[in-house]
């Protein structure tokens, strides 16, 4: 007999949040539209996962299941007369697709995360704490007929929207999105870009989601201002992306933190040794005097001679005065 706890891969004391996380993961993994090469097994697994979630996510159904197993939900329970079951005539499981749609709020789980932010204000929705989302009135896809339905496979689509100001949302000037991927979730990728004018500045937000990792880049008038990965700012990735784009206008760094100048390439040392030796030689040896000027030399010698004669006269006077005293 199928054990619903084993189907979802959770412990018997799992919390409601654990059960939701398990269903989300397995429903996305086994959705028939994502497993066209193994559709029969995927449909079976998808149905089991939906049944397990439908029972374990409801406190009353879970309590009966824990006590009497699946038979208790069917109105049996090993004789059925020794307990009162609220499902006396048997519990009917819903269509797994209905469970799936209800869980994801009627929107395509393979793409709604990627469109959510640009359209939230437009539809009047507000995003709560990270990981929780307020559900809007109706399906996201019902607003625009160009989106694929749940049965279309979500394997590839490319769509764009412009001039949302005409729809009553003056701040959002443009939005475009591209999503693609094949069978399975391993190679699914989505890129969405939205542009807003805020106080005369063009703010562009680019979101890239690939293999479960979300990367968000925010530009202001063409200059990259912030970069987050899975909601966390990454300064190293920001610096690397700025470098790649040639946007090196980073904040001034203290002198001690500036990178040292790179050494001269070895190729230059090999190909121009005479140039380097001449430069280094000029730095090491003393500077030679300028051209010889005969007039300046004569003036110097004459001045030196006068000083020497004056010194001799002073010494002679001192000697005479010394003899007179004796």
From Swiss-Prot:
Changing residue 93 to L: In LGMDD1; the mutation results in inefficient inhibition of protein aggregation by isoform B. It comes from the Eukaryota. InterPro entries: DnaJ_domain, DnaJ_domain_CS, DNJB2/6-like, J_dom_sf. Residues 119-242 are annotated as: Interaction with KRT18. The modification Phosphoserine is found at residue 277. CDD domains: DnaJ. Widely expressed. Highest levels in testis and brain, and lower levels in heart, spleen, intestine, ovary, placenta, lung, kidney, pancreas, thymus, prostate, skeletal muscle, liver and leukocytes. In testis, expressed in germ cells in the earlier stages of differentiation pathway as well as in spermatids. In brain, expressed at a higher level in hippocampus and thalamus and a lower level in amygdala, substantia nigra, corpus callosum and caudate nucleus. It is found in: Cytoplasm, Perinuclear region; Nucleus; Cytoplasm, Myofibril, Sarcomere, Z line. One of its GO terms (molecular function) is protein folding chaperone. Residues 249-326 are annotated as: Disordered. It holds the Pfam family DnaJ. Keywords: Chaperone, Cytoplasm, Disease variant, Limb-girdle muscular dystrophy, Methylation, Nucleus, Phosphoprotein. Residues 2-146 are annotated as: Interaction with HSP70. Residues 2-69 form the J domain. PANTHER family: DNAJ HOMOLOG SUBFAMILY B MEMBER 2, SIMILAR TO DNAJ HOMOLOG SUBFAMILY B MEMBER 6 (HEAT SHOCK PROTEIN J2) (HSJ-2) (MRJ) (MDJ4). It is linked to Muscular dystrophy, limb-girdle, autosomal dominant 1: An autosomal dominant myopathy characterized by adult onset of proximal muscle weakness, beginning in the hip girdle region and later progressing to the shoulder girdle region. Has a stimulatory effect on the ATPase activity of HSP70 in a dose-dependent and time-dependent manner and hence acts as a co-chaperone of HSP70. Plays an indispensable role in the organization of KRT8/KRT18 filaments. Acts as an endogenous molecular chaperone for neuronal proteins including huntingtin. Suppresses aggregation and toxicity of polyglutamine-containing, aggregation-prone proteins. Also reduces cellular toxicity and caspase-3 activity. This is DnaJ homolog subfamily B member 6. The lineage of its organism: Eukaryota, Metazoa, Chordata, Craniata, Vertebrata. The gene is DNAJB6.
């Amino acid at each position: 007999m199928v054990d619903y706890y084993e189907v979802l891969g959770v412990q018997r004391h799992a919390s409601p949040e654990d059960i939701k996380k398990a269903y989300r993961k397995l429903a996305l993994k086994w959705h028939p539209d994502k497993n066209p090469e193994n559709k029969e097994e995927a449909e079976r697994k998808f149905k089991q996962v939906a049944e397990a979630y439908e029972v374990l996510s409801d406190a009353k159904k879970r309590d009966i299941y824990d006590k009497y197993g699946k038979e208790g939900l069917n109105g049996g329970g090993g004789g059925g007369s020794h307990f009162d079951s609220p499902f006396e005539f048997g519990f009917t499981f819903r269509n797994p697709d209905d469970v799936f749609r209800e869980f994801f709020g009627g929107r395509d789980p393979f793409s709604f995360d990627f469109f959510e932010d640009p359209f939230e204000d437009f539809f009047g929705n507000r995003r709560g704490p990270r990981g929780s989302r307020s559900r809007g009135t109706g399906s996201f896809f019902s607003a625009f007929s160009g989106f694929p339905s749940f049965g279309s496979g979500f394997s590839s689509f490319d769509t764009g929207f412009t001039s949302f100001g005409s729809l009553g949302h003056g701040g959002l000037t443009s939005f475009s999105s591209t999503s693609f991927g094949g069978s399975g979730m391993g190679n699914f990728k989505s890129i969405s870009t939205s542009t807003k004018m805020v106080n005369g500045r063009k703010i562009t937000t680019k979101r890239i989601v690939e293999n479960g990792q979300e990367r968000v880049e925010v530009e202001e008038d063409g200059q990259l201002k912030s970069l987050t990965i899975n909601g966390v700012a990454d300064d190293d990735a920001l610096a690397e992306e700025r470098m790649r784009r040639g946007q090196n206008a980073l904040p001034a760094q203290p002198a001690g933190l500036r990178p040292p100048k790179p050494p001269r390439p070895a190729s230059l040392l090999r190909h121009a040794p005479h140039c380097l030796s001449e430069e280094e030689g000029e730095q090491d040896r003393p500077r030679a005097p300028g051209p010889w000027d005969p007039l300046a030399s004569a003036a110097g010698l004459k001045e030196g001679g006068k000083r020497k004669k004056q010194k001799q006269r002073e010494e002679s006077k001192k000697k005479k005065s010394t003899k007179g005293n004796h």
